[in-house]
Structure formats: structure tokens, C-alpha cells
Amino acid sequence: MDKRTALLYAQLKPYKALVNKTSGFIKWALARVENPYVACSFGKDSAVMLHLILQHKPTIKIRFIRWKNETEFIDNYDEVINMWGQLNLEQIELCRETLLDKRKDRYETTDYDSYFIGLRQEESVARRITLKSNGIFYKNKSEMIRISPLSEWSEKEVSTYMFSNNLPILNTYLIDGSKSRTTSRIPREDFGIRQSFLNDLKHRDFASYQKITNYFPEITL
């Protein structure tokens, strides 16, 4: 979707109703938790969610995970953060060793009782099942509440909000294959970057393919 199309779509009543509904839910959720934070990657989904949340709680804590050597993939981080203005931002530095660490206490304890995250049903079958079964205001076994205000949003609606509000995002999410959360810029233990994505990237953007495989040699095709 280009910006012109997004601005036209933003005038439609169903879209406006969705934005108002989501904003109302965020206000409702904030009134029911004591110490929330926003899990933010500064991609499209989390940028839209963050912008909506800041209208109700400008001082909310924002947690961004930054991986060692990630600057090879992100060269506009400082620019994006500056464009957002004054944020209550906490940057968490991690590395591959942290990813593979299986100790139960590998994550620090915090006083947070809840977090906002930009999960959407449209992203995958697994996400749809999870969000439908657990709901968008869900308390897990550790008593942490997961809040997913964008659950019902489509890619079109996310793009519309982003363009119509001129939201800055990290350029890593503008690279093919990084636009969706299911093809993450940070692989899990089995380094589950899709083989189809790698094969496609290898042929269309060999420089980006080399950067990824240099850092994660075990996923080389």
C-alpha cells in the first residue's frame, strides 16, 4: 500500500471505527494494570501500537531488544528514536549466547505486571489460534498479563495507520522477508528462518543474504 492509498483508506468509517475501538481498549487495559511496558521492535505493528498507547500514557516504559552486531542490519536506529521524540526507552542488549541459555533465571526479575505486544491474528494460523483461545487481555501462569490491542488489525489497516500518522520504523523491516513477524530478524534456537525466504533473498539481494549467513553460518543454504 502506498501513502496516497493509505490516506484515502483512512477516511473510511470502518477503519476509523477500528482505531477508536482499539484506542478505547487500550484506555480500558491501562486502567486495569499497575506497571505495564510496551514490547517494541519499531517495526510497523509495534510502531502503530506504540503510537496509540502513547496518546493515553506518554510515560509508559518501552522495552527494545537489541542484538549484538545488529547494526549490520539496522543503520537508522538513532534517527528513528529521535523522530519519535522523548521516550521512556529501555534498550536490552542480548547475544547468541543469551538466546541459547537454558537457565530458568536467565531473564532478570522485574516489577512489571503486564506488557503490550503487537500480535495480530492475520500473521499466522498459530497466532490466530492463540489470540482467539486466550483473548487479547491474558494472564499467563507467571501472573503476567499480555495485552494485544492489534489482534484484529489487518496488514492494510496497520499500513494505513503508519502512513497516515507518518510513523518512523527501522529500515530492517523494509527489507523483503522482514516485514512480517513470522520471518524474524532474530532467529530462535533452531534458527528458524524459512528456507524459502533465504533462497529468495539469496537470488534477489545477495548482500543482505551474506550479512545474515555471516552472522548465522548454520543457516547457509
What are these regions (language model features)?
Residues 1-221:
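Nucleotide-activated chemistry modules centered on ATP-dependent adenylation/adenylyltransferase
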